[in-house]
C-alpha cells in the first residue's frame, strides 16, 4: 500500500507577503491506498474446538468441531482516497479554518454473509463481496471572540456533508438486510445494502 501528498503554503509567496490580514494560507492534495484485514483468526484457516455436540446418524454426539466456516480466498479490503484541503488563518490569527473535499472508494469489502448448510458447517461465511463509494466535504471555522492579556474566549463551527453508496454487491437485485424492525410479529427489515443505493435508506411499504 502507498500514499502521496503535497502542500503549497501560498502565504509564503511574494505576491501575498504584503497582504497583512492573511497570516497563513495553504492548499493540500493527497492520494493513498490503505488495507484492512479486519477479520479474526479462523476465517482463512480451519480451527477446531472440543466439547461441541454434532449430529451423527440422527444422534447428537460430543466431539471436536469447526469454529467457523473458512474462506481460503479472503484478501485485504482496499480503500483508496483522494483529498483536497485548504487551511487558512486571518486577521492576526483571530479567524481560522479549514475545508476538505474527499472521495473514497473501498474495494473487496469484507462482510459476513449467509452460507448454505450443507455443505457449510455454519450458517455464515466471511467474503470479499463488493465495493463502496464515499464522498463529501468538511468545513471548520473558528475565531477569537475575546482576546486579552489574561483572558481568551474562542468559538468554532463545524459543517459536513457525506454520501455513501454501494457500487457493487454481487449480482443485480442482490441485497443484504441490515436493520430489523423492533415491532412484535417479525415485520421484517427496514434497511438493506443494495447496488447503487445510498447506505441508510429505508425500505418500507407505502401507504396512501
Question: Can you name each region flagged by the protein language model?
Answer:
Residues 201-208:
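Short, intrinsically disordered, charge-balanced linker/junction segments flanking boundaries
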Residues 1-197:
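Extracellular/periplasmic, surface-exposed regions of secreted and cell-surface proteins
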Amino acid at each position: 500500500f502507498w500514499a502521496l501528498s503535497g502542500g503549497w503554503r501560498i502565504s509564503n509567496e511574494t505576491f501575498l507577503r504584503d497582504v497583512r490580514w492573511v497570516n497563513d494560507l495553504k492548499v493540500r492534495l493527497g492520494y493513498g491506498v490503505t488495507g484492512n484485514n479486519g477479520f479474526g483468526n479462523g476465517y482463512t484457516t480451519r480451527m477446531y474446538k472440543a466439547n461441541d455436540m454434532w449430529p451423527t446418524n440422527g444422534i447428537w454426539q460430543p466431539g471436536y468441531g469447526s469454529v467457523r466456516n473458512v474462506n481460503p480466498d479472503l484478501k485485504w479490503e482496499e480503500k483508496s482516497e483522494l483529498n483536497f484541503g485548504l487551511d487558512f488563518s486571518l486577521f492576526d490569527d483571530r479567524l481560522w479554518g479549514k475545508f476538505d473535499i474527499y472521495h473514497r472508494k473501498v474495494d473487496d469489502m469484507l462482510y459476513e454473509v449467509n452460507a448454505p448448510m450443507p455443505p457449510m458447517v455454519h450458517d455464515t461465511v466471511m467474503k470479499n463481496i463488493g465495493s463502496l463509494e464515499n464522498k463529501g466535504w468538511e468545513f471548520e471555522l473558528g475565531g477569537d471572540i475575546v482576546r486579552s492579556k489574561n483572558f481568551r474566549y474562542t468559538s468554532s463551527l463545524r459543517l459536513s456533508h457525506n454520501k455513501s453508496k454501494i457500487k457493487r454487491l454481487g449480482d443485480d437485485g442482490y441485497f443484504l438486510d441490515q436493520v430489523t424492525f423492533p415491532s412484535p410479529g417479525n415485520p421484517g427489515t427496514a434497511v438493506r445494502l443494495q447496488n447503487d443505493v445510498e447506505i441508510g435508506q429505508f425500505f418500507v411499504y407505502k401507504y396512501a
